[in-house]
């Protein structure tokens, strides 16, 4: 693929003012979504996967507007002059967002047009009503009357029928109708329910031909069933995005009831963005704009498709050649070596599981075994996000019903999962689980399980520390780490952290575990300072980071100081990055890359040289639930877990981090001007995701791997010298 970049490059030292030290957070997020859209242009990816990337980018942009843009609009309306890290006021940020978002939307539509054209060449099409044959119309007639007509609500708009409330992300068909008996004009709306599929698949004899009809076209096709005696004079879609940020009353006597009330308010949030189809007649456009009352600068006229998130409905299973090859995650051989006994495997040695390349089933099995094991006396579990029919929740309920002491720390404020978490909390309570909701003013984002088991005359604790949610569905596509241990110090620390979450009892000490909001920031600062001292003393130094977001100004400034001292810093940041790398006099020793590929990068890893070249057994390695953002350091409960076991240490350092740094197939690099440039594949090309799919992990190999790593084994997974931070 040709290199993608912008022509700007920084050749002179940049002044170290705030606006030059930091990249704007919101614009960095839009740049991330642009990389997602660029993935849809990647000819290496199968066509339906490219369509999926467009759908994901649409969903991302919807959430961005409903949360981030909504917050800035609220600040601007309130007259707040709060400035971003790069010195912009809310109004200035909204102007820049508007400019970048419009360009992004144009790119989305252009790429969508290309992908749909290529899909048509492969036999998968969206067809217009005039392309339907008699058999198609007969099928759609029945489909409409049985599945669509009963749930549609046509709404006339006149003094007796006021303009209705349009739900968040609601797609509405606006109509201009002519009454046939007197030529009178009527305007009407038909909200298209989200519960109905937007793309209706037509029956075809072979999957080699797949045809879809859009719901809005189906409604127009049978409009006479809804408005008999009228003819259509004009129509078009519009879509409303509403403010979904919600403030919870932390001091309420009944926290759950308070949250339910707040969630009802969210459904009627202020309109933040209004997108109108370009073919919407002028008089209907004026009506919609006047009634919806979205900000004037957040009105978008779209000549292409509205509601790109719905494109995911076109991703069918019966055209496997248009999808990524099916991949079955490996189950760790280490567990199999012990007959599926998770506790025996963990007692033998710590184990880390690399999702989705290794199955999330091992996490489920760990908790199911705990639930059914008569020697297990207690289970403690955090829950931030999980699936509707979660096997994790099922295991906790089974354990409680069998008489075990079960505690679940359920975070009610996981954005867009609040209602689901309220439901599961009630289900857990009904089964006898002790449910707690954590801290007022703090979100519990740590991913932690603790199982206490009677073994002989003693009690032994087993812990699971994760970087991702206990969600078996997202675990199929998110890259995350699950660390299992029965180390006495770590499990004791886990128990202390649970006591902190349930009883507000701040631990007097922690043996190994670092946690937010108390010690993470301080420990990270000390680790960076140690690298600065090593560099100044002429000893090996270096920092490797793998994060979703790098935003915190204080930590970024600390990395700048490390760079100035000569510490080489390499960062793999999937999403937002406010740090400017490669700026002479500020960050010339810092490199930042991003991997956007088949799987969503989600694990958080931090590595510090600790006086040794990298990678080396002496390097300090941590995995974490926390990104480097102020909220993760100061306003959330998070874990920052040291890795000591040699095999686990080698897997995280020599295998995962090394290969991520080496990837040149799905990678982008960030320049000092804030521009992301696609990395050109080498010869041979290196894909981190393909490597992890085809190479067993070191920790999970069990009997296939005995003893410490040999130098040859380390060399086999060594990254290319171009990414070596200690050259």
Swiss-Prot record:
**InterPro entries, sorted:** PP_kinase, PP_kinase_C_1, PP_kinase_middle, PP_kinase_middle_dom_sf, PPK_C_dom2, PPK_N_dom, PPK_N_dom_sf
Does the entry feature the keyword Magnesium, yes or no?
yes
Task: Provide one Gene Ontology cellular component.
Answer: polyphosphate kinase complex
Q: Which reaction does it catalyse?
A: [phosphate](n) + ATP = [phosphate](n+1) + ADP
Which keywords does the record carry?
ATP-binding, Kinase, Magnesium, Metal-binding, Nucleotide-binding, Phosphoprotein, Transferase
Where Mg(2+) binds, per the record, is at 385, 415
Residues annotated as binding ATP: 60, 478, 574, 602
Question: What GO molecular-function term can you cite, just one?
Answer: metal ion binding
Q: Which spans are transmembrane here?
A: none
PTM per UniProt? An intermediate of this reaction is the autophosphorylated ppk in which a phosphate is covalently linked to a histidine residue through a N-P bond.
Report the sequence similarity comment from the record: Belongs to the polyphosphate kinase 1 (PPK1) family.
Q: What does this protein do?
A: Catalyzes the reversible transfer of the terminal phosphate of ATP to form a long-chain polyphosphate (polyP).
- Protein name as annotated: Polyphosphate kinase
